[in-house]
Protein backbone atom coordinates (compact mmCIF):
# COMPACT_ATOMS: atom_id res chain seq x y z
CA UNK A 1 0.00 0.00 0.00
CA UNK A 2 1.32 3.44 -0.92
CA UNK A 3 0.72 6.95 0.36
CA UNK A 4 -0.66 9.77 -1.75
CA UNK A 5 1.33 12.94 -2.33
CA UNK A 6 -0.92 16.02 -2.35
CA UNK A 7 -0.11 18.56 -5.07
CA UNK A 8 -0.80 22.14 -3.98
CA UNK A 9 -0.52 24.55 -6.91
CA UNK A 10 0.17 28.21 -6.15
CA UNK A 11 0.66 29.51 -9.71
CA UNK A 12 -2.22 31.95 -9.24
CA UNK A 13 -0.88 33.30 -5.95
CA UNK A 14 2.87 32.89 -5.45
CA UNK A 15 3.50 32.49 -9.17
CA UNK A 16 1.72 35.75 -9.91
CA UNK A 17 4.10 37.58 -7.57
CA UNK A 18 6.79 37.26 -10.25
CA UNK A 19 7.32 40.81 -11.61
CA UNK A 20 5.15 41.26 -14.68
CA UNK A 21 3.12 38.08 -14.19
CA UNK A 22 -0.10 39.84 -13.15
CA UNK A 23 -3.18 38.11 -14.54
CA UNK A 24 -6.74 39.28 -15.06
CA UNK A 25 -9.70 37.54 -13.43
CA UNK A 26 -10.61 35.70 -16.63
CA UNK A 27 -7.01 34.62 -17.21
CA UNK A 28 -6.85 33.20 -13.68
CA UNK A 29 -10.16 31.44 -14.21
CA UNK A 30 -8.91 29.77 -17.40
CA UNK A 31 -5.76 28.59 -15.66
CA UNK A 32 -7.74 27.35 -12.64
CA UNK A 33 -9.93 25.25 -14.94
CA UNK A 34 -6.82 23.80 -16.55
CA UNK A 35 -5.38 23.00 -13.11
CA UNK A 36 -8.62 21.20 -12.25
CA UNK A 37 -8.38 19.27 -15.52
CA UNK A 38 -4.83 18.39 -14.47
CA UNK A 39 -6.39 17.05 -11.23
CA UNK A 40 -4.41 19.29 -8.94
CA UNK A 41 -5.49 18.55 -5.35
CA UNK A 42 -5.37 22.13 -4.03
CA UNK A 43 -5.48 25.36 -6.05
CA UNK A 44 -4.29 28.44 -4.18
CA UNK A 45 -6.43 30.94 -6.09
CA UNK A 46 -4.99 34.11 -4.60
CA UNK A 47 -4.79 36.39 -1.60
CA UNK A 48 -8.38 37.57 -1.18
CA UNK A 49 -7.63 40.42 1.24
CA UNK A 50 -4.90 41.98 -0.90
CA UNK A 51 -7.21 43.76 -3.36
CA UNK A 52 -10.76 43.77 -4.68
CA UNK A 53 -9.45 42.23 -7.88
CA UNK A 54 -7.87 39.30 -6.04
CA UNK A 55 -11.05 38.83 -3.96
CA UNK A 56 -13.13 38.64 -7.15
CA UNK A 57 -10.68 36.18 -8.71
CA UNK A 58 -10.74 33.86 -5.68
CA UNK A 59 -14.53 34.11 -5.56
CA UNK A 60 -14.91 33.31 -9.27
CA UNK A 61 -12.57 30.32 -9.03
CA UNK A 62 -14.35 29.06 -5.89
CA UNK A 63 -17.62 29.10 -7.84
CA UNK A 64 -16.22 27.47 -10.98
CA UNK A 65 -13.97 24.70 -9.62
CA UNK A 66 -15.83 21.59 -8.48
CA UNK A 67 -13.24 18.88 -7.81
CA UNK A 68 -10.09 20.57 -6.48
CA UNK A 69 -9.89 22.27 -3.10
CA UNK A 70 -9.79 26.06 -3.55
CA UNK A 71 -7.54 27.96 -1.15
CA UNK A 72 -6.96 31.61 -0.28
CA UNK A 73 -3.93 33.00 1.49
CA UNK A 74 -4.49 35.18 4.57
CA UNK A 75 -2.21 36.88 7.03
CA UNK A 76 -2.69 35.88 10.66
CA UNK A 77 -5.36 38.49 11.44
CA UNK A 78 -9.14 38.42 11.63
CA UNK A 79 -9.71 40.80 8.70
CA UNK A 80 -7.67 38.77 6.21
CA UNK A 81 -9.14 35.48 7.38
CA UNK A 82 -12.73 36.73 7.25
CA UNK A 83 -12.14 38.12 3.77
CA UNK A 84 -10.73 34.77 2.62
CA UNK A 85 -13.71 32.90 4.06
CA UNK A 86 -16.12 35.27 2.33
CA UNK A 87 -14.42 34.74 -1.04
CA UNK A 88 -14.47 30.96 -0.56
CA UNK A 89 -18.01 30.54 0.75
CA UNK A 90 -19.35 29.01 -2.50
CA UNK A 91 -16.47 26.55 -2.93
CA UNK A 92 -17.21 22.82 -2.84
CA UNK A 93 -14.00 22.39 -0.85
CA UNK A 94 -12.48 25.45 0.82
CA UNK A 95 -9.16 25.98 2.58
CA UNK A 96 -7.77 29.02 4.36
CA UNK A 97 -3.97 29.27 4.34
CA UNK A 98 -2.82 31.61 7.09
CA UNK A 99 0.76 32.58 7.85
CA UNK A 100 3.02 34.62 10.10
CA UNK A 101 6.81 34.93 10.13
CA UNK A 102 8.70 33.00 12.81
CA UNK A 103 12.39 33.65 12.10
CA UNK A 104 14.20 36.01 14.48
CA UNK A 105 15.12 38.25 11.56
CA UNK A 106 11.53 38.62 10.34
CA UNK A 107 10.04 39.00 13.80
CA UNK A 108 12.47 41.76 14.76
CA UNK A 109 12.92 43.64 11.50
CA UNK A 110 9.60 43.18 9.69
CA UNK A 111 6.92 42.42 12.26
CA UNK A 112 8.53 44.21 15.21
CA UNK A 113 6.96 41.62 17.47
CA UNK A 114 8.27 39.40 20.25
CA UNK A 115 8.20 35.61 19.88
CA UNK A 116 5.41 35.40 22.46
CA UNK A 117 3.32 37.90 20.49
CA UNK A 118 3.85 35.90 17.30
CA UNK A 119 2.90 32.67 19.08
CA UNK A 120 -0.31 34.21 20.40
CA UNK A 121 -1.23 35.74 17.05
CA UNK A 122 -0.73 32.39 15.32
CA UNK A 123 -2.92 30.72 17.95
CA UNK A 124 -5.72 33.27 17.59
CA UNK A 125 -5.58 33.22 13.79
CA UNK A 126 -5.96 29.45 13.49
CA UNK A 127 -8.69 29.41 16.14
CA UNK A 128 -10.64 32.11 14.28
CA UNK A 129 -10.16 30.44 10.88
CA UNK A 130 -11.22 27.03 12.25
CA UNK A 131 -14.59 28.52 13.15
CA UNK A 132 -15.12 29.54 9.50
CA UNK A 133 -13.86 26.52 7.52
CA UNK A 134 -12.69 23.04 8.43
CA UNK A 135 -9.56 22.90 6.27
CA UNK A 136 -6.84 25.17 7.71
CA UNK A 137 -3.24 25.38 6.55
CA UNK A 138 -0.65 27.22 8.64
CA UNK A 139 2.74 28.42 7.39
CA UNK A 140 5.51 29.81 9.60
CA UNK A 141 7.04 32.23 7.08
CA UNK A 142 10.82 31.85 6.77
CA UNK A 143 10.34 28.62 8.70
CA UNK A 144 13.62 27.03 7.61
CA UNK A 145 15.63 29.91 9.13
CA UNK A 146 13.59 29.90 12.35
CA UNK A 147 14.80 28.67 15.73
CA UNK A 148 13.71 25.01 15.89
CA UNK A 149 12.67 25.22 19.56
CA UNK A 150 10.40 28.20 18.93
CA UNK A 151 9.09 26.67 15.71
CA UNK A 152 8.11 23.51 17.58
CA UNK A 153 6.12 25.58 20.09
CA UNK A 154 4.29 27.47 17.35
CA UNK A 155 3.45 24.38 15.30
CA UNK A 156 2.31 22.35 18.32
CA UNK A 157 0.06 25.26 19.31
CA UNK A 158 -1.61 25.72 15.91
CA UNK A 159 -2.19 21.99 15.48
CA UNK A 160 -3.90 21.99 18.88
CA UNK A 161 -6.09 24.86 17.64
CA UNK A 162 -7.18 22.88 14.57
CA UNK A 163 -4.63 23.40 11.79
CA UNK A 164 -4.95 20.45 9.41
CA UNK A 165 -1.87 21.13 7.25
CA UNK A 166 1.50 22.44 8.42
CA UNK A 167 3.60 23.98 5.67
CA UNK A 168 7.28 24.69 6.34
CA UNK A 169 8.57 27.21 3.78
CA UNK A 170 12.11 27.74 2.63
CA UNK A 171 11.07 31.31 1.85
CA UNK A 172 14.38 32.56 0.49
CA UNK A 173 15.67 29.35 -1.13
CA UNK A 174 18.48 28.90 1.40
CA UNK A 175 18.05 25.18 2.11
CA UNK A 176 20.15 22.22 0.99
CA UNK A 177 18.23 18.96 0.26
CA UNK A 178 19.60 16.70 3.00
CA UNK A 179 19.51 19.46 5.61
CA UNK A 180 15.97 20.51 4.69
CA UNK A 181 14.69 16.93 4.72
CA UNK A 182 16.18 16.33 8.17
CA UNK A 183 14.82 19.68 9.38
CA UNK A 184 11.26 18.55 8.56
CA UNK A 185 11.92 15.10 10.03
CA UNK A 186 13.21 16.53 13.32
CA UNK A 187 10.19 18.83 13.67
CA UNK A 188 7.80 15.93 13.15
CA UNK A 189 9.67 13.78 15.67
CA UNK A 190 9.82 16.49 18.35
CA UNK A 191 6.25 17.78 18.18
CA UNK A 192 3.89 15.52 20.18
CA UNK A 193 0.80 16.13 18.02
CA UNK A 194 2.58 16.20 14.65
CA UNK A 195 0.58 13.19 13.47
CA UNK A 196 -2.63 15.24 13.66
CA UNK A 197 -1.72 17.29 10.57
CA UNK A 198 -0.43 16.74 7.05
CA UNK A 199 3.06 18.18 6.58
CA UNK A 200 3.86 20.26 3.55
CA UNK A 201 6.92 21.77 1.86
CA UNK A 202 7.20 25.08 -0.01
CA UNK A 203 10.61 25.71 -1.55
CA UNK A 204 11.99 28.62 -3.55
CA UNK A 205 14.62 28.21 -6.24
CA UNK A 206 17.23 30.86 -5.38
CA UNK A 207 20.04 28.28 -5.35
CA UNK A 208 18.43 26.11 -8.03
CA UNK A 209 17.33 23.42 -5.57
CA UNK A 210 13.59 23.97 -5.10
CA UNK A 211 12.60 20.63 -6.63
CA UNK A 212 15.45 18.72 -4.92
CA UNK A 213 14.61 20.30 -1.56
CA UNK A 214 10.91 19.50 -1.97
CA UNK A 215 11.66 15.88 -2.80
CA UNK A 216 13.99 15.63 0.21
CA UNK A 217 11.23 17.04 2.40
CA UNK A 218 9.00 14.26 1.12
CA UNK A 219 11.47 11.35 1.22
CA UNK A 220 13.50 12.23 4.32
CA UNK A 221 11.09 14.50 6.17
CA UNK A 222 7.87 12.61 5.57
CA UNK A 223 5.97 15.54 4.06
CA UNK A 224 2.89 14.54 2.09
CA UNK A 225 2.10 17.81 0.35
CA UNK A 226 4.29 19.75 -2.09
CA UNK A 227 3.57 23.38 -2.94
CA UNK A 228 4.59 24.21 -6.49
CA UNK A 229 3.81 26.21 -9.63
CA UNK A 230 3.46 25.52 -13.34
CA UNK A 231 6.83 26.11 -15.06
CA UNK A 232 8.31 26.96 -11.64
CA UNK A 233 6.82 30.46 -12.00
CA UNK A 234 7.47 32.74 -9.03
CA UNK A 235 9.29 35.77 -7.73
CA UNK A 236 13.09 35.97 -7.87
CA UNK A 237 14.31 32.59 -9.21
CA UNK A 238 10.89 30.99 -8.95
CA UNK A 239 9.23 28.15 -7.04
CA UNK A 240 9.31 24.38 -7.11
CA UNK A 241 8.17 23.27 -10.57
CA UNK A 242 4.97 21.21 -10.56
CA UNK A 243 5.81 19.26 -13.70
CA UNK A 244 9.27 18.33 -12.44
CA UNK A 245 8.27 17.18 -8.97
CA UNK A 246 5.26 15.23 -10.29
CA UNK A 247 7.24 13.43 -12.98
CA UNK A 248 10.09 12.72 -10.56
CA UNK A 249 7.70 11.01 -8.14
CA UNK A 250 5.89 9.11 -10.91
CA UNK A 251 9.03 8.09 -12.81
CA UNK A 252 10.85 7.03 -9.61
CA UNK A 253 7.88 5.45 -7.88
CA UNK A 254 10.24 2.60 -7.01
CA UNK A 255 12.14 5.04 -4.76
CA UNK A 256 9.43 7.33 -3.41
CA UNK A 257 6.64 4.76 -3.10
CA UNK A 258 4.02 7.48 -3.51
CA UNK A 259 1.01 8.00 -5.74
CA UNK A 260 0.05 11.34 -7.27
CA UNK A 261 -3.40 12.04 -8.68
CA UNK A 262 -2.18 14.33 -11.47
CA UNK A 263 -3.36 13.55 -15.02
CA UNK A 264 0.04 14.10 -16.56
CA UNK A 265 -1.24 14.20 -20.15
CA UNK A 266 -2.43 17.76 -19.48
CA UNK A 267 0.94 19.04 -18.20
CA UNK A 268 2.15 20.50 -21.51
CA UNK A 269 -1.17 22.26 -22.13
CA UNK A 270 -0.99 23.82 -18.66
CA UNK A 271 2.60 24.91 -19.26
CA UNK A 272 1.73 26.54 -22.58
CA UNK A 273 -1.29 28.29 -21.13
CA UNK A 274 0.66 29.79 -18.24
CA UNK A 275 3.53 30.81 -20.52
CA UNK A 276 1.29 32.48 -23.07
CA UNK A 277 -0.82 34.18 -20.40
CA UNK A 278 2.08 35.64 -18.43
CA UNK A 279 4.57 36.20 -21.25
CA UNK A 280 7.23 34.14 -19.45
CA UNK A 281 8.70 31.96 -22.19
CA UNK A 282 9.65 28.38 -21.27
CA UNK A 283 13.34 27.79 -21.94
CA UNK A 284 13.93 25.10 -24.61
CA UNK A 285 15.93 22.85 -22.27
CA UNK A 286 13.41 23.05 -19.41
CA UNK A 287 12.75 19.59 -17.99
CA UNK A 288 9.48 17.94 -19.06
CA UNK A 289 7.91 20.94 -20.84
CA UNK A 290 10.80 22.55 -22.76
CA UNK A 291 10.77 22.24 -26.56
CA UNK A 292 13.98 20.16 -26.40
CA UNK A 293 12.95 17.99 -23.44
CA UNK A 294 12.46 14.96 -25.70
CA UNK A 295 14.72 15.98 -28.61
CA UNK A 296 17.77 13.91 -29.54
CA UNK A 297 20.43 15.60 -31.69
CA UNK A 298 23.31 13.17 -31.20
CA UNK A 299 23.47 10.49 -33.89
CA UNK A 300 24.23 7.84 -31.29
CA UNK A 301 21.22 8.90 -29.21
CA UNK A 302 18.94 9.05 -32.26
CA UNK A 303 19.98 5.56 -33.32
CA UNK A 304 19.39 4.22 -29.83
CA UNK A 305 15.93 5.78 -29.52
CA UNK A 306 14.88 4.45 -32.92
CA UNK A 307 15.91 0.93 -31.87
CA UNK A 308 14.45 1.13 -28.35
CA UNK A 309 13.02 4.30 -26.83
CA UNK A 310 14.03 3.42 -23.30
CA UNK A 311 17.73 3.55 -24.24
CA UNK A 312 17.67 7.33 -23.77
CA UNK A 313 14.11 8.18 -22.64
CA UNK A 314 12.99 7.62 -19.05
CA UNK A 315 9.44 8.84 -19.75
CA UNK A 316 7.30 9.13 -22.85
CA UNK A 317 6.62 12.51 -24.43
CA UNK A 318 2.95 11.65 -24.95
CA UNK A 319 2.55 10.88 -21.23
CA UNK A 320 3.01 14.57 -20.40
CA UNK A 321 0.95 15.87 -23.31
CA UNK A 322 3.38 16.28 -26.20
CA UNK A 323 1.45 15.45 -29.37
CA UNK A 324 3.10 13.69 -32.30
CA UNK A 325 0.52 15.25 -34.62
CA UNK A 326 1.27 18.97 -34.45
CA UNK A 327 -0.99 20.09 -37.33
CA UNK A 328 -4.54 19.95 -36.04
CA UNK A 329 -6.78 22.29 -38.04
CA UNK A 330 -6.98 24.31 -41.25
CA UNK A 331 -9.20 26.76 -43.12
CA UNK A 332 -11.79 24.05 -43.94
CA UNK A 333 -12.18 22.96 -40.31
CA UNK A 334 -15.62 23.57 -38.82
CA UNK A 335 -16.81 24.97 -35.51
CA UNK A 336 -17.34 21.54 -33.92
CA UNK A 337 -13.79 20.43 -34.77
CA UNK A 338 -12.45 23.68 -33.34
CA UNK A 339 -14.53 23.30 -30.16
CA UNK A 340 -13.39 19.68 -29.74
CA UNK A 341 -9.74 20.67 -30.09
CA UNK A 342 -10.21 23.36 -27.43
CA UNK A 343 -11.52 20.67 -25.08
CA UNK A 344 -8.60 18.35 -25.90
CA UNK A 345 -6.20 21.19 -25.09
CA UNK A 346 -7.91 21.77 -21.75
CA UNK A 347 -9.39 25.11 -22.75
CA UNK A 348 -12.89 25.92 -21.52
CA UNK A 349 -14.37 29.22 -22.62
CA UNK A 350 -17.15 30.53 -20.41
CA UNK A 351 -19.94 30.88 -22.97
CA UNK A 352 -21.05 30.03 -26.49
CA UNK A 353 -20.50 33.69 -27.31
CA UNK A 354 -16.82 33.40 -26.41
CA UNK A 355 -16.51 30.22 -28.49
CA UNK A 356 -18.06 32.07 -31.43
CA UNK A 357 -15.60 34.96 -31.07
CA UNK A 358 -12.68 32.54 -30.79
CA UNK A 359 -13.87 30.58 -33.84
CA UNK A 360 -14.20 33.77 -35.88
CA UNK A 361 -10.61 34.66 -34.98
CA UNK A 362 -9.52 31.13 -35.86
CA UNK A 363 -11.09 31.41 -39.34
CA UNK A 364 -9.44 34.79 -39.82
CA UNK A 365 -6.07 33.27 -38.88
CA UNK A 366 -6.67 30.24 -41.13
CA UNK A 367 -7.16 32.56 -44.11
CA UNK A 368 -3.65 33.94 -43.51
CA UNK A 369 -1.87 30.78 -42.33
CA UNK A 370 -2.30 27.38 -43.98
CA UNK A 371 -1.40 25.21 -40.98
CA UNK A 372 -2.85 25.82 -37.53
CA UNK A 373 -0.89 24.35 -34.60
CA UNK A 374 -1.91 23.78 -30.99
CA UNK A 375 0.30 26.70 -30.02
CA UNK A 376 -1.65 28.95 -32.41
CA UNK A 377 -4.95 27.95 -30.83
CA UNK A 378 -3.70 28.56 -27.30
CA UNK A 379 -2.34 31.96 -28.31
CA UNK A 380 -5.64 32.78 -29.97
CA UNK A 381 -7.80 31.98 -26.93
CA UNK A 382 -5.36 33.84 -24.69
CA UNK A 383 -6.27 37.01 -26.62
CA UNK A 384 -8.13 39.31 -24.24
CA UNK A 385 -10.71 40.17 -26.92
CA UNK A 386 -11.96 36.56 -26.84
CA UNK A 387 -13.03 36.67 -23.18
CA UNK A 388 -16.01 38.44 -21.68
CA UNK A 389 -13.89 40.56 -19.39
CA UNK A 390 -14.15 44.23 -20.36
CA UNK A 391 -10.85 45.84 -21.26
CA UNK A 392 -10.15 49.55 -21.53
CA UNK A 393 -8.07 49.23 -24.70
CA UNK A 394 -8.73 46.94 -27.67
CA UNK A 395 -6.93 46.47 -30.98
CA UNK A 396 -8.88 47.13 -34.22
CA UNK A 397 -6.45 47.63 -37.12
CA UNK A 398 -3.01 48.89 -38.05
CA UNK A 399 -1.46 50.30 -41.22
CA UNK A 400 2.22 51.09 -41.59
CA UNK A 401 4.43 52.48 -44.32
CA UNK A 402 8.17 51.89 -44.48
CA UNK A 403 10.80 52.40 -47.18
CA UNK A 404 14.56 52.03 -47.01
CA UNK A 405 16.12 55.31 -45.94
CA UNK A 406 12.86 56.82 -44.65
CA UNK A 407 11.38 56.90 -41.15
CA UNK A 408 8.51 54.41 -40.89
CA UNK A 409 5.02 55.66 -40.07
CA UNK A 410 2.21 53.71 -38.40
CA UNK A 411 -1.48 54.48 -38.04
CA UNK A 412 -3.38 52.42 -35.49
CA UNK A 413 -7.09 52.20 -34.79
CA UNK A 414 -7.97 50.95 -31.32
CA UNK A 415 -10.81 51.24 -28.84
CA UNK A 416 -10.77 53.18 -25.58
CA UNK A 417 -13.70 52.17 -23.37
CA UNK A 418 -15.51 50.90 -26.46
CA UNK A 419 -14.97 53.98 -28.64
CA UNK A 420 -12.67 53.83 -31.66
CA UNK A 421 -9.77 56.25 -31.91
CA UNK A 422 -7.14 56.71 -34.62
CA UNK A 423 -3.57 57.75 -33.95
CA UNK A 424 -0.42 58.06 -36.09
CA UNK A 425 3.27 58.45 -35.41
CA UNK A 426 6.71 58.00 -36.91
CA UNK A 427 9.39 55.86 -35.28
CA UNK A 428 12.82 54.28 -35.64
CA UNK A 429 11.10 51.20 -37.06
CA UNK A 430 7.54 50.00 -37.69
CA UNK A 431 7.23 48.50 -34.19
CA UNK A 432 8.49 51.69 -32.56
CA UNK A 433 6.14 53.76 -34.73
CA UNK A 434 3.10 51.67 -33.78
CA UNK A 435 3.80 51.92 -30.06
CA UNK A 436 4.47 55.65 -30.29
CA UNK A 437 1.15 56.01 -32.11
CA UNK A 438 -0.61 54.35 -29.18
CA UNK A 439 1.24 56.50 -26.65
CA UNK A 440 0.44 59.67 -28.60
CA UNK A 441 -3.19 59.17 -27.61
CA UNK A 442 -2.96 57.27 -24.31
CA UNK A 443 -0.07 59.21 -22.72
CA UNK A 444 0.46 56.53 -20.06
CA UNK A 445 4.03 57.63 -19.33
CA UNK A 446 4.95 53.97 -18.73
CA UNK A 447 8.52 52.84 -19.31
CA UNK A 448 9.10 49.79 -21.50
CA UNK A 449 11.59 47.52 -19.74
CA UNK A 450 11.29 44.44 -21.96
CA UNK A 451 10.38 43.67 -25.57
CA UNK A 452 10.74 40.11 -26.84
CA UNK A 453 9.51 38.07 -29.80
CA UNK A 454 9.00 34.31 -29.81
CA UNK A 455 7.97 32.23 -32.84
CA UNK A 456 4.95 30.14 -31.83
CA UNK A 457 5.67 27.41 -34.39
CA UNK A 458 8.56 26.59 -36.67
CA UNK A 459 7.78 27.91 -40.15
CA UNK A 460 8.02 31.31 -41.83
CA UNK A 461 4.20 31.39 -41.60
CA UNK A 462 4.47 31.20 -37.81
CA UNK A 463 2.68 33.64 -35.60
CA UNK A 464 4.99 35.86 -33.64
CA UNK A 465 4.26 36.04 -29.94
CA UNK A 466 5.40 39.38 -28.53
CA UNK A 467 5.86 40.16 -24.85
CA UNK A 468 5.96 43.78 -23.71
CA UNK A 469 6.83 44.63 -20.12
CA UNK A 470 5.83 48.06 -18.85
CA UNK A 471 6.72 49.75 -15.58
CA UNK A 472 4.86 52.66 -14.02
CA UNK A 473 4.74 53.99 -10.46
CA UNK A 474 6.46 50.88 -9.12
CA UNK A 475 4.10 48.49 -10.88
CA UNK A 476 5.38 46.03 -13.49
CA UNK A 477 3.12 44.21 -15.94
CA UNK A 478 3.53 41.96 -18.98
CA UNK A 479 1.36 42.19 -22.07
CA UNK A 480 1.27 39.44 -24.69
CA UNK A 481 0.09 39.64 -28.30
CA UNK A 482 0.21 37.13 -31.15
CA UNK A 483 -0.19 37.58 -34.90
CA UNK A 484 1.57 36.49 -38.12
CA UNK A 485 2.43 40.19 -38.53
CA UNK A 486 5.02 41.07 -35.87
CA UNK A 487 4.04 44.76 -35.93
CA UNK A 488 0.40 43.89 -35.22
CA UNK A 489 1.47 41.42 -32.49
CA UNK A 490 3.57 44.19 -30.93
CA UNK A 491 0.66 46.63 -30.90
CA UNK A 492 -1.61 43.99 -29.34
CA UNK A 493 1.00 43.25 -26.68
CA UNK A 494 1.40 46.95 -25.85
CA UNK A 495 -2.38 47.40 -25.48
CA UNK A 496 -2.55 44.23 -23.36
CA UNK A 497 0.12 45.62 -21.03
CA UNK A 498 -1.72 48.95 -20.79
CA UNK A 499 -4.91 47.11 -19.82
CA UNK A 500 -3.13 45.33 -17.00
CA UNK A 501 -1.42 48.53 -15.91
CA UNK A 502 -4.76 50.29 -15.69
CA UNK A 503 -6.56 47.50 -13.86
CA UNK A 504 -3.85 46.31 -11.50
CA UNK A 505 -4.80 47.36 -8.01
CA UNK A 506 -2.17 47.97 -5.38
CA UNK A 507 -1.60 44.62 -3.71
CA UNK A 508 -0.41 43.74 -0.28
CA UNK A 509 2.93 41.94 -0.65
CA UNK A 510 2.52 38.33 0.40
CA UNK A 511 5.75 36.50 1.00
CA UNK A 512 6.02 32.79 1.67
Swiss-Prot record:
Pathway: Amino-acid biosynthesis; L-leucine biosynthesis; L-leucine from 3-methyl-2-oxobutanoate: step 1/4
UniProt GO MF annotations: 2-isopropylmalate synthase activity; acetyl-CoA C-acetyltransferase activity; manganese ion binding
This protein's UniProt keywords: Amino-acid biosynthesis, Branched-chain amino acid biosynthesis, Cytoplasm, Leucine biosynthesis, Manganese, Metal-binding, Transferase
Top enzyme category: transferase
Disulfide links within the chain: none
Cofactor: Mn(2+)
GO cellular component, one term: cytosol
Segments of this protein annotated with the region Regulatory domain: 394-512
Name of the protein this chain belongs to: 2-isopropylmalate synthase
Quaternary structure and partners: Homodimer.
Residues the entry annotates as binding Mn(2+): 14, 202, 204, 239
Membership in a protein family: Belongs to the alpha-IPM synthase/homocitrate synthase family. LeuA type 1 subfamily.
Reactions catalysed, as given in the entry: 3-methyl-2-oxobutanoate + acetyl-CoA + H2O = (2S)-2-isopropylmalate + CoA + H(+)
Enzyme Commission code(s) on record: 2.3.3.13
Gene name of this polypeptide: leuA
Protein purpose: Catalyzes the condensation of the acetyl group of acetyl-CoA with 3-methyl-2-oxobutanoate (2-ketoisovalerate) to form 3-carboxy-3-hydroxy-4-methylpentanoate (2-isopropylmalate).
CDD domains hit by this protein: DRE_TIM_IPMS (cd07940)
Pfam family, one: LeuA_dimer
Subcellular locations according to the entry: Cytoplasm
One biological process term in Gene Ontology: L-leucine biosynthetic process
Keyword GTP-binding: no
Main location: cytoplasm
Amino acid sequence: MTDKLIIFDTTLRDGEQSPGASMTRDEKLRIARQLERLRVDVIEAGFAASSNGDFESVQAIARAVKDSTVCSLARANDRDIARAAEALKEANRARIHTFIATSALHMEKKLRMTPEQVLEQARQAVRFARNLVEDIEFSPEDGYRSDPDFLCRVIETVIAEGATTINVPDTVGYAIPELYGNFIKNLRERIPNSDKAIWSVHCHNDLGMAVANSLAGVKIGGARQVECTINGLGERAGNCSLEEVVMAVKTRRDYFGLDVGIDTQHIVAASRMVSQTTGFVVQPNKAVVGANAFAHASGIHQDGVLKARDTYEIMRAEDVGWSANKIVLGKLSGRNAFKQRLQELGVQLESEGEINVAFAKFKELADRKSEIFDEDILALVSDESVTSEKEQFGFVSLAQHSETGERPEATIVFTVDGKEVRSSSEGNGPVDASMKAIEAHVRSGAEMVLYSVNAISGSTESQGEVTVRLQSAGRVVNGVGADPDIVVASAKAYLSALNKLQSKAERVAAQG
